[in-house]
Swiss-Prot record:
Annotated residues for binding of S-adenosyl-L-methionine: G88, W90, D111, D127, D151
Disulphide linkage map: none
Key words of the record: Cytoplasm, Methyltransferase, rRNA processing, S-adenosyl-L-methionine, Transferase
GO terms, molecular function: rRNA (uridine-2'-O-)-methyltransferase activity
Lineage: Bacteria, Pseudomonadati, Pseudomonadota, Alphaproteobacteria, Hyphomicrobiales
Enzyme nomenclature, EC number: 2.1.1.166
Name of this protein: Ribosomal RNA large subunit methyltransferase E
InterPro entries registered for this protein in UniProt: RNA_methyltr_RlmE, RNA_MeTrfase_FtsJ_dom, rRNA-MeTfrase_E, SAM-dependent_MTases_sf
Amino acid sequence: MKKTTRRTAGGRGGAGSHELYQRVKKKAGTIKASSRRWLERHLNDPYVHQSKADGYRSRAAYKLIEINERYKILKKGQKIIDLGAAPGGWCQVAARLVESKDYNPSVVGIDYLHMEPLPGVAILEMDFFHEDAPQELISTLGSKPDVVLSDMAAPTTGHRQTDHLRTIALCEAAVHFSISVLKPGGHFLTKTFQGGAEGNLLATLKQNFKKVHHVKPPASRAESVELYLLALQFKGKTD
């Protein structure tokens, strides 16, 4: 199933942090200690508060903002594909920076999870691994992309190496997709987890892009094994 949407009323609101905190306090005795720690950290996170104030759907928006401030990968007039786009924070940032329009979106996001519509973003509600997904993305965008973004990550199990390997598999799929569709000179950004199994992934990126950077933006929590790989200046397909 797919869903293509080209307009929206805006970002997602939600209950205030104080109200949520009060609900958490009342239920503190019924949730696990690990879950309680996560909730407390979430409620005290300045990026969470800022995302609500700025109208972004997730704190992840600031990771892309910070990466872009350093590397300038998103510019006016570009075409963008966002893999694993839900809930839409990266799409919001990309649409703003490339000045995407509702009547002719230059940002396409795909996720099997439901996403509410966003201004200047076409949304495909389908699995990126569906055989029709690559063609649907290009058809919806109307041309090859200048940038492919991927914030995809497999659901975590709590076992670090397992989580690393599962996320690397998603990264590899995103890399092969980007190599098949990017314009020459285009860029690719993907999330990964540190763990030592990314050798082949890095080799593929270095073979196909002029520069590859490991990036950990300030918005990425210091204790997290999360890391971003940024591949710049796609060399072009070699048939």
